[in-house]
Amino acid sequence: MLLLLLGFLGPAACWALGPAGPGSSELRSAFSAARTTPLEGTSEMAVTFDKVYVNIGGDFDAATGRFRCRVPGAYFFSFTAGKAPHKSLSVMLVRNRDEVQALAFDEQRRPGARRAASQSAMLQLDYGDTVWLRLHGAPQYALGAPGATFSGYLVYADADADAPARGPAAPEPRSAFSAARTRSLVGSDAAPGPRHRPLAFDTELVNIGGDFDAAAGVFRCRLPGAYFFSFTLGKLPRKTLSVKLMKNRDEVQAMIYDDGASRRREMQSQSVMLPLRRGDAVWLLSHDHDGYGAYSNHGKYITFSGFLVYPDLAAAGPPALKPPEL
C-alpha cells in the first residue's frame, strides 16, 4: 500500500499541504506508518506506531496513532492489520472520539494461523478532526507481529482551503466517492428480479461531484481520466464470497473470491486503477445464488471507494453502455 501511496502523491492526485495563505503554492498532507510489535486488546485501544515512512505536513502522531486534520477536505485512508495466532482480529477506523467509519475483522483462531485483513475508506474531514485505529479492547483480540500499517493522504482540499494556493486559476476536476453497506446479503436461486444487479449501499461517506448513486450502487463517469477503485467485503460463515468489480454491462475488471467452508467471519480486499470515458459505469456484482453471500453490520465491513487520479481533458466520444436495469 505504501507504493500506491507514494505513486499517488503527485499534484494531480492530491494537493500537498503547506501553510495556507500568500506564497503557498500547494496543499500537502500525507502519512504512512507501521507497527512492528504485537498488541493485545486493552482499555487504551488506540493502535500506536513505531515506524513512520511518510509524514508530509507533520499531521500524524505515531506515539498516539492519531492523524489530525490541518486542511479541511477529502482524505483517503487505508490500513492492514495482522492477526495473532489463537486470537481474533477487530480493528476499526475511527473519526474523532467514537465515530466508527469502517472495520477490519477476522475471527479465525486456528492454531498457528497468521493472517491479515485490510480496509480502506475516504472521509470528509474538517479542521481539527482526528482519525485513528482502534483495536477491540477485549483480551481475545490482538495484533500479531508485524502488527499493522496505516496510511492516509489528502485527495481534494475544500474549496475555501484551496483558494489561497490556487488564486484565480480554474478549479481542478474533481470526482470521488466512498460508501459502505451495513447489511449482509445472501444469495438465493429463488430470489425475484434480475441476477446481474449492482450491490447497493446505505451509507455515503463522500460523494464529490455527485457521480455515485449509493442506492443503485453505480458510479457514472462524468470526467474522463484514470480512476482508482478499492473495495472490501466480509465473508459470511460457511458461504462462498464472490464479488466482481464491473465496468459497464459485463466487463469484469477485478474480483474477490473465497470458497472456504469456515464458520468464522473473514474479509477480502481488492483494488485497481481504470481508464474511464464519459458515461462509463463502474459497480460491484455479487454472485446471487444459493451458497453465496457477504457479511456486514453497523461496523461497515463492506466498503467501496473511487476517485479521479488524473483527468483526461482531451478525451471525447459517445457515452458508453448503460449499466443493467435496477
Curated annotation (Swiss-Prot):
Tissues expressing this chain: High expression in testis, kidney, and brain. Expressed in brain and kidney (at protein level). Within the brain, highly expressed in cerebellum, cortex, hippocampus and hypothalamus, and lower expression in hindbrain (at protein level). Serum levels were increased in leptin-deficient ob/ob mice (a genetic model of hyperphagia and morbid obesity) relative to age-matched lean controls. No difference in serum levels were detected between mice fed a low-fat versus high-fat diet for 14 weeks.
Region annotation Disordered: where it falls in the sequence: 164-193
Keyword flag Secreted: yes
SUPFAM superfamilies for the chain: TNF-like
Subcellular localization(s) per the UniProt record: Secreted
Classification via InterPro entries: C1q_dom, Cerebellin_Synaptic_Org, Tumour_necrosis_fac-like_dom
Signal peptide start-end: 1-16
Major location (coarse): secreted
Species of the source: Mus musculus
The protein's name in its UniProt record: Complement C1q tumor necrosis factor-related protein 4
Residues in C1q domain copies: 24-161, 170-315
Subunit relationships: Homomultimer. Forms trimers, hexamers and high molecular weight oligomers.
Pfam families: C1q (PF00386)
GO cellular component, one term: extracellular space
Function: May be involved in the regulation of the inflammatory network. The role as pro- or anti-inflammatory seems to be context dependent. Seems to have some role in regulating food intake and energy balance when administered in the brain. This effect is sustained over a two-day period, and it is accompanied by decreased expression of orexigenic neuropeptides in the hypothalamus 3 hours post-injection.
GO biological process: cell surface receptor signaling pathway via STAT; gene expression; positive regulation of interleukin-6 production; positive regulation of interleukin-6-mediated signaling pathway; positive regulation of non-canonical NF-kappaB signal transduction; positive regulation of tumor necrosis factor production; reduction of food intake in response to dietary excess
Record gene name: C1qtnf4
A single GO molecular function term of this UniProt record: cytokine activity
Keyword Signal: yes
Induction: Up-regulated during acute colitis induced by injection of dextran sulfate sodium (DSS).
Keywords per UniProt: Cytokine, Repeat, Secreted, Signal
